[in-house]
Amino acid sequence: MADVRVFFATNRNHQPGNKKQVFGKTINPDGVAALRFGRADFTADPVKPVLKTLHVYPDVLNEPDVLKTGGGMFMEDLRKAMAFGPRCDTMVFVHGFNVSFTGALQAGALMAQSLKVGGHPVNVVVFS
């Protein structure tokens, strides 16, 4: 099986020093609307995909060019995935706080490796 990429947006608290759990169990201290964006790559597995890499887009404050913000970089990478790959369609999976952030991403990876639309795989964006 090929590797699986999952995009994400989250309002969880960012823990940049914690390599095992980059986002915690609480809301971002800056408020529920303070979002961070990124992507995670998994080694595909039909039962439990394995997280290989996690990239958090930089949180660029006071940047007038939206494409240079974390949200802008996220949207551009997702647009490219939809425009130039077999994954033309995208599903947004909203996951709550009842599991870890990594657990939510892993659930998204399971969906990304199994869902198809018109015989083609789909992109998955996890919001947790």
Regions found by a protein language model. Name each.
Residues 1-125:
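Flexible, membrane-associating and regulatory peripheral segments of lipid-active enzymes
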